[in-house]
Amino acid sequence: MNVQKPEGKDTTLTTTDGIAARLGGSPGLIVQEVGWDEDCDSTLSEAIEDAIGSELLDEDSYEICDIVLLWWRSDDGDLVDGLVDAVRPLADTGRVWLLTPGNGRSNALAPGDIAESAQLAGMVQTKAERFGDWQGSCLVRRGNKQ
């Protein structure tokens, strides 16, 4: 969504601060990114990096983190396994942002599949957000509603 600035320049409301706020990114948080590939929206990754003031941890890191950005497509395998793996480096109060292709896109996941997989992985969905062509589902450990 674009708005006109007084001086006539377009600015996108879904960039840096807006995206970071919706994902819960803030200075000092540790964020790991898993499953990134060429089809992903790098704007999300860059917005989080700007908000936290550091680079994202890659998927091979074993550092405890506050947020995991998990890019997932229907052909990536078993989502339950992916979620269980994503929870391992997560702090007790952390959250996983599951980012899947939006409805109607190739490799999209049905909302029911996400809910069922989250439940089987011991997680619950606390909110959903649309980020361009990607659908975001915020997941936390069961009993840790944020």
Where does each model-flagged region fall?
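S-adenosyl-L-methionine-dependent methyltransferase catalytic core, i.e., the SAM/SAH-binding region
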Residues: 2-146
